[in-house]
């Protein structure tokens, strides 16, 4: 288990300055989007063609806000989302790029420890323990409190499942990153 998780972090040999631990549902989409006709589409290899439902729906406005944050602060992305499960880093980069997000900034995943009873905070902690010497600081962006893991190097910012990544949360993160 430990070896498998170390391989999943994909952090060996990467010199990182700042990290965004990024969840997807409740961050780049909103709970009410589940009923949106925009969630249905007709030709996407990430969705099951038989049900024509986009399992990876992204609100373009929220994605633009995340993209601007990543670009403005030169952040690298580590995915904590369940969307990462069963995908390679390259496949997930393509998924992000196809959804208005900077896939080129994705450098890896937290390990999937859910089957071992790990919370998202535990997965983030595991990642940080195995890559700490390379990380200057980090931000965790998630709609669930179970991802809350703060240290002197980083901070958790919670979004709302129903509102996603709002301007208010964006302002708080920007103030945090500017004052470090």
Language model features with spans:
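Short, exposed beta-strand "edge-strand" segments with a Pro/Gly-rich flavor and a Y/T-containing core
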Residues: 15-16, 83-87, 161-165
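Alpha-helical substrate-recognition element adjacent to the catalytic core
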Residues: 19-114
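A generic local structural motif
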Residues: 7, 64, 125-127
């Amino acid at each position: 288990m430990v070896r498998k998780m170390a391989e999943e972090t994909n952090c060996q040999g990467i010199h990182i300055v700042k990290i965004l631990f990024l969840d997807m549902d409740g961050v780049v989409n909103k709970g009410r989007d589940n009923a949106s006709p925009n969630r249905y589409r007709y030709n996407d290899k990430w969705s099951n063609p038989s049900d024509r439902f986009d399992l990876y729906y992204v609100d373009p406005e929220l994605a633009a806000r995340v993209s601007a944050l990543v670009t403005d602060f030169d952040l690298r992305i580590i995915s904590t989302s369940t969307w990462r499960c069963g995908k390679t880093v390259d496949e997930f980069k393509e998924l992000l790029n196809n959804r208005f997000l900077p896939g080129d900034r994705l450098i890896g995943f937290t390990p999937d420890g859910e089957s071992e009873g790990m919370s998202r905070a535990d997965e983030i902690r595991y990642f940080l323990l195995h890559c700490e010497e390379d990380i200057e600081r980090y931000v965790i962006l998630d709609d669930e409190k179970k991802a809350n893991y703060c240290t002197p190097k980083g901070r958790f910012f919670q979004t709302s499942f129903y509102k996603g990544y709002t301007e208010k949360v964006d302002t708080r993160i920007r103030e945090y990153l500017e004052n470090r």
